[in-house]
């Protein structure tokens, strides 16, 4: 994912506020510890300041900890924090500021702060590197300093070096494709180490970069039905085209293995969400029609595979087949919302916004983008809630790890807080980019094209760029280029090829450096390209049957426009995306009519099949051409109907010519192109006179790359033809054939019926099972517990085979607690929290002393003296007392006696009077005697 800075050596640790010393050598019990992970969290800041301190949640923000200037303008401090997550900020010369060196942020209350994620440093850990054919894994002791108890299972066969605490694993014997090692182990004292995931590729895929990708986007339910047993019952209330149609993982896998994607040059698949989606239907945006969740964007489970698409095992098989074929797989992650039946909505209502409905009155899509709801049954996730954001991130990590995905597409990017994208990207980098394998994150930030003035499009580019960077997305769908060209140039023709050239070039200089953008001409969100390019019709934007939906085009124009558009799309920079069916010109109106079932070669007409063959051939050339995948873009020649441009690296060059005109066009080239020769199309290229004739309505490609075979003159590079059947759908498909010789044979026309000979209504003439088979009642043993990982919906009797996910891990699950445990799955009530400050008067001499107060708020009041002080300033100092007159002294004596009597109380006064009388009586008797 991180093409902006690719780490060579990665340690499995939580991201810290800044770089920290992770390795050092210590002595433990008299035995030298070769390597130990850092035992304190390091905060760092670089810059010119008089004083720098860090304040955070760990002590309730009460006191700051000063950073020490260890070198000019380099400040740091080590803090032994307990494992958990802490909001914090730096205070730099009395100014509170975020930590620019730490991309991970979060909200504590209503304020965004930097977030320190502190790992459990007492545990051991692993780190790893790959160089050439050697995988090197290092052991880092925990607090005890203990070494490993043995070799991890994932490294079975590796060589251990006791002196360096290092395993070395020879990769040379591994087959081509993707491998993922899950390294786990424990120390000799029994302490379990933090695990390490090591995804890497061998063979041709090892040097893949995402500029090499040709992405094929498919909606699983609408691709191919490979397993009719998982088809759901029809929903009568669903509008036409808005019900489930039976496509599944098995259908995708079958076409991976048949070479359907590889033959087109496709090396990356983007599948729509496969988490369990809502049952039934929901009201469409028009408020009239009912639609189902076949698309997957209404999730009702955070980690459940939708059984209507297949089983977890079938999804694993799909990914394994793709990797074996050198194809990456991208998930589609819905992070903005859930369906109202999702458990998060019921269990944690505080995790969701209570906004208006996007697009309704006083609810603008832009102004209210962060809190508005797409529909009233789609609660909007509030990423400012830390527990919500961490749960959503953990779910994405689970999907990627469980099914060994290679990245993902993030849905509705601009509708979530910025921290959603940043924090998600940081966590994916840490977990999966451990030995240099790039995980690609592609975003959907729907923007437009604001006119011919580049300045007018600054906001369009800027909004898309906002989410791309080193700790963010790797790229996004290029919506500006799409809106500038797809309809304006290719389907409508209102703009010419000079306009096309200009805006293609702008996509190379207006986005973040290093971004891998995804250009496209069609998608699952807009009407089909072929219908938009169909002249003389006005139904291309209709979406419901009663409006009248587009039919299959009956002229050449839509297919000619599609060839021009895809010839351009597959030869410009970026990771271009083909929407399933566009490769042969699938027709349709707006959603859901743009989501027809994919059709194979036997179901296409000649125009569609010819378009498919041409687009597949261009994709195959792109797959072989380094220049077309990784080269820069340079305009060579442009007129209203003709465009010639070069794609070139330091070592390779390809020339692309597009002519949408009705007549051939001749272009004179520079001498630098004399060594080029045709690799696609039928150009007339004279290398001596440097003239290139591009036939009318055609796409041509020339290249000087040695990967394309050349003849003795070097002027033509057509490889030797291999005749045969090139259609993968045919019975006699020949993968080695390069030219179709018309020999393809196909199965007879499908006859629907029950094909199962064991069924009561078996039809011997049927060739395609239509699901009508009926059977006598029979027990089907299997796991009937819906909570089990291997739940079998078809089972009728329990056979004791149920397996379950790992037991809950008790611990503190509240991220705000000081002892928060990120690995805990159930809260055991052990959470502890920093003391909460109670303001009040803490002076025991005050009249309003508060014994519960912990912080004095200056509210104390005190009793005054018995009268005003002589000068009224209440100081009571020595200088405020003046001498008293005798009468005043007697009065004071009397007052003193009264005060004395008053102080001893009624009983005391009686006793005192008794003593006085006794004394008087004694005196009288003494006198009398």
Language-model features: where?
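A cross-kingdom C-terminal cell-surface attachment/processing module
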Residues: 906-925
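Surface-exposed, short loops/turns at beta-strand junctions within beta-sandwich domains
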Residues: 81-85, 171-178
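C-terminal low-complexity, Ser/Thr- and acidic/Pro-rich disordered "stalk" regions positioned immediately N-terminal
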Residues: 834-838, 859-901
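Aromatic-rich carbohydrate-binding modules that target alpha-glucans
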Residues: 34-85, 91-119, 150-165
């Amino acid at each position: 994912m991180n093409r902006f800075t690719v780490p060579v050596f990665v340690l499995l640790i939580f991201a810290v506020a800044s770089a920290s010393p992770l390795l050092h050598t210590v002595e433990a019990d008299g035995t030298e510890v070769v390597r130990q992970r850092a035992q304190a969290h390091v905060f760092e800041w670089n810059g010119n300041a008089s004083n720098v301190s860090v304040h955070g949640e760990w002590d309730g923000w009460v006191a700051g900890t000063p950073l020490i200037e260890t070198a000019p303008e380099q400040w740091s401090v080590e803090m032994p924090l307990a494992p958990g997550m802490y909001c914090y900020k730096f205070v730099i010369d009395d100014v509170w500021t975020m930590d620019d060196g730490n991309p991970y942020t979060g909200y504590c209350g209503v304020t965004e702060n930097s977030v320190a994620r502190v790992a459990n440093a007492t545990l051991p850990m692993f780190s790893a590197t790959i160089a050439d054919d050697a995988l090197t894994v290092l052991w880092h002791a925990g607090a005890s300093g203990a070494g490993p108890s043995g070799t991890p299972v994932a490294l079975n066969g590796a060589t251990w070096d006791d002196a360096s605490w290092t395993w070395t694993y020879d990769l040379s014997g591994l087959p081509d494709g993707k491998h993922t090692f899950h390294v786990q182990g424990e120390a000799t004292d029994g302490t379990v180490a933090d695990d390490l995931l090591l995804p890497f590729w061998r063979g041709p895929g090892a040097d893949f970069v995402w500029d090499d990708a040709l992405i094929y986007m498919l909606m699983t339910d609408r691709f191919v039905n490979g397993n009719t047993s998982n088809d759901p019952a029809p929903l009568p209330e669903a509008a036409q085209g808005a019900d489930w149609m039976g496509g599944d993982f098995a259908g995708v896998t079958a076409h991976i293995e048949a070479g359907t994607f590889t033959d087109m040059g496709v090396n990356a698949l983007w599948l729509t969400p496969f988490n369990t989606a809502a049952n039934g239907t929901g009201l469409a945006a028009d408020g009239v029609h009912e639609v189902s969740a076949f698309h997957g964007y209404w999730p009702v489970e955070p980690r459940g595979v939708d059984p209507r698409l297949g089983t977890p095992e079938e999804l694993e098989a799909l990914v394994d087949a793709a990797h074996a074929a050198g194809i990456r797989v991208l998930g589609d992650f819905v992070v903005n919302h859930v369906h109202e039946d999702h458990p998060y909505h019921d269990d944690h209502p505080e995790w969701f916004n209570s906004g208006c409905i996007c697009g309704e009155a006083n609810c603008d899509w832009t102004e209210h983008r962060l809190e508005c709801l797409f529909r009233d049954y789609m609660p909007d996730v509030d990423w400012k809630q830390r527990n919500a954001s961490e749960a959503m991130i953990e779910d994405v990590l689970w999907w990627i790890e469980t099914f060994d995905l290679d990245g993902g597409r993030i849905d509705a990017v601009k509708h979530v807080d910025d921290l959603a994208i940043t924090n998600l990207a940081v966590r994916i980098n840490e977990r999966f980019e451990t030995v240099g394998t790039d995980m690609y994150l592609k975003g959907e930030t729907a923007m437009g094209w604001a006119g011919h003035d580049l300045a007018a499009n600054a906001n369009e580019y800027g909004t898309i760029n906002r989410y791309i960077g080193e700790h963010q997305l790797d790229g996004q769908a290029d919506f500006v280029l799409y809106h500038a060209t797809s309809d304006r140039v290719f389907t409508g023709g209102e703009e010419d090829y000079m306009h096309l050239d200009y805006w293609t070039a702008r996509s190379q200089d207006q986005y973040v450096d290093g971004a891998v953008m995804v250009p496209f001409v069609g998608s699952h969100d807009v009407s089909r390209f072929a219908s938009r390019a169909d002249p003389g019709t006005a139904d291309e934007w209709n979406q419901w049957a009663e409006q009248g939906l587009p039919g299959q085009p009956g002229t050449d124009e839509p297919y000619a426009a599609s060839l021009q558009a895809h010839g351009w799309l597959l030869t410009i920079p970026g990771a271009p995306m083909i929407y399933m069916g566009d490769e042969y010109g699938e027709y349709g109106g707006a959603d859901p009519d743009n989501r027809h079932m994919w059709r194979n070669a036997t179901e296409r007409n000649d125009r569609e099949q010819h378009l498919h063959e041409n687009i597949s051939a261009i994709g195959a050339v792109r797959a072989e051409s380094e220049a077309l995948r990784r080269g820069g873009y340079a305009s060579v020649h442009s007129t209203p109907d003709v465009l010639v441009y070069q794609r070139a690296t330091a070592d390779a060059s390809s020339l692309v010519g597009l002519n949408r005109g009705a007549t051939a066009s001749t272009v004179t080239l520079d001498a630098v192109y004399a060594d080029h020769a045709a690799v696609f199309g039928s150009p007339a290229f004279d290398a001596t006179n440097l003239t290139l004739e591009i036939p009318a309505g055609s796409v041509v490609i020339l290249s000087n790359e040695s990967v394309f075979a050349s003849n003795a003159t070097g002027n033509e590079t057509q490889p030797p033809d291999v005749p045969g059947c090139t259609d993968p759908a045919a019975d006699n498909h020949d993968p080695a054939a390069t030219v179709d010789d018309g020999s393809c044979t196909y199965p007879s026309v499908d006859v629907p019926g029950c094909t199962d000979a064991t069924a009561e209504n078996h039809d011997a003439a049927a060739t395609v099972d239509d699901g009508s088979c009926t059977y006598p009642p029979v027990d089907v043993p299997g796991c009937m517990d819906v909570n089990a990982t291997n739940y079998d919906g078809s089972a009728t009797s329990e056979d004791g085979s149920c397996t379950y996910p790992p037991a809950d891990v008790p611990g503190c699950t509240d991220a705000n607690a000081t002892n928060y445990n990120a690995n805990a799955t159930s809260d055991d009530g052990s959470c502890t929290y920093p003391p909460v400050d109670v303001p009040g008067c803490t002076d025991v001499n005050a009249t309003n002393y508060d014994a519960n107060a912990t912080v004095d708020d200056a509210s104390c009041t005190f009793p005054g003296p018995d009268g005003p002080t002589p000068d009224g300033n209440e100081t009571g100092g020595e200088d405020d007392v003046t001498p008293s007159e005798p009468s005043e002294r007697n009065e004071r004596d009397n007052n003193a006696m009264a005060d004395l009597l008053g102080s001893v109380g009624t009983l005391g006064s009686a006793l005192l009077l008794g003593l006085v009388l006794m004394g008087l009586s004694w005196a009288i008797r003494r006198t009398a005697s």
